[in-house]
Design a protein with these regions (language model features):
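Histone-fold recognition with a strong bias for associated Lys/Arg-rich disordered tails
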Residues: 1-159
Length: 159
């Protein structure tokens, strides 16, 4: 956790809590998405909010499609699903690519949006959220160009 910004750490703690509340034994990308949104002040939360991603709708859909009904306790904070772990590993690569000293919420969201087969992206798609627009808005919030973002997202999907 030492590689994360305070906001990213808070989002991951909230993700673990979301997993416990929904009865999941592991933290999935859907829980990380909820954690990013519940953190509320990071770049990822601002971009998601501006992109009309509503926490209530995500929680409702996640409960309907994904969760178990019984709360459980995650034994260790590293109890991520393989895809969630991959997203977190890729968030480190995104931070390095953008020359950031620490992994921020924006890097986690960026890695998540590129992982098109993850539960979080499937939830966003089900909510009719334009993933490409969200990615471009994220790049814009980070001070990058949108046209380059469309190309990067397309490359992320194929590789």
């Amino acid at each position: 956790m030492e590689r994360y910004t305070e906001k990213a750490k808070e989002a991951l703690i909230l993700a673990a809590e979301a997993a416990e509340e929904t009865g999941s034994r592991t933290v999935g990308t859907e829980h990380i998405l909820v954690g990013l949104m519940k953190e509320g002040t990071g770049t990822a939360a601002r971009v998601l909010e501006a992109g009309d991603v509503k926490l209530e709708r995500v929680l409702e859909l996640e409960k309907k499609l994904v969760s178990s009904s019984q709360p459980t306790q995650i034994r260790d904070r590293e109890g991520y699903t393989p895809i969630a772990r991959k997203v977190l590993e890729n968030s480190y690569r995104e931070a390095v690519r953008f020359h950031a000293p620490l992994i921020g919420t924006e890097h986690i969201l960026m890695a998540m949006l590129k992982q098109t087969d993850c539960v979080a992206v499937r939830l966003l798609n089900t909510l009719n959220i334009n993933i490409q627009r969200l990615y471009i808005d994220l790049l814009s919030a980070m001070g990058e160009e949108g046209a380059a973002g469309r190309e990067e997202l397309a490359q992320g999907r194929s590789g």
